[in-house]
């Protein structure tokens, strides 16, 4: 009987100790993610950066969510920024945020507790300019110590989201498909 009580007591202590020492936080937040978009045409290259991207990564479920403040993209030229934000293009006053909510489809390929680089596929819904599309993209997750970095590069066809200049110089200066790169860093607690 004493052995049984001793075993139960030790099991309880181990369970409590494990509960308080194991990393239980599975939802991580990045408040300063970076997104760059790049457009190449024969006339000019256009690039813009946004360092105010907020995202979450749930390491237990594989859910990823991104919120992108569209007016926070910074351009080399003020006129580019004006065209980008205008009602004739992205209309960022009406559509102030782009959002993505998705899932890592091969979560079992990632060990968030072991340093390494993992190739994953993320599928979900992208909402941009009031249009929601289902997309599937590849990404790289790097685990190094208590840091987790998620990076992806994809091509985005503007017409899919009803984004286009109807005519004039801006319509010939921006590519129909742009390259979008994203990098978000998360810190594990503990």
Spans of model-derived segments:
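Low-complexity, acidic/polar, glycine-enriched regions of mature
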Residues: 20-190
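Positively charged n-region of N-terminal signal peptides that target proteins for export
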Residues: 1-5
């Amino acid at each position: 009987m004493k052995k049984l009580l001793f075993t139960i007591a030790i099991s309880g202590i181990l369970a409590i100790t494990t509960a308080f020492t194991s990393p239980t936080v599975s939802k991580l937040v990045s408040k300063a993610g970076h997104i760059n978009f790049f457009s190449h045409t024969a006339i000019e290259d256009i690039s813009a950066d946004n360092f105010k991207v907020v995202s979450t990564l749930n390491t237990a479920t594989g859910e990823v969510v991104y919120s992108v403040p569209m007016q926070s993209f910074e351009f080399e030229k003020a006129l580019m920024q004006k065209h980008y934000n205008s009602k004739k293009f992205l209309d960022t006053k009406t559509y102030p945020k782009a959002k993505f909510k998705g899932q890592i489809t091969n979560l079992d390929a990632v060990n968030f507790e072991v340093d390494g680089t993992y190739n994953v596929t993320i599928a979900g819904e992208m909402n941009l300019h009031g249009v929601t599309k289902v997309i599937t993209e590849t990404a790289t997750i790097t685990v190094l110590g208590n840091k987790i970095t998620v990076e992806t590069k994809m091509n985005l066809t503007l017409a899919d989201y009803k984004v286009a200049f109807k005519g004039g110089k801006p319509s010939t200066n921006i590519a129909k498909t742009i390259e979008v790169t994203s990098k978000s860093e998360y810190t594990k607690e503990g």
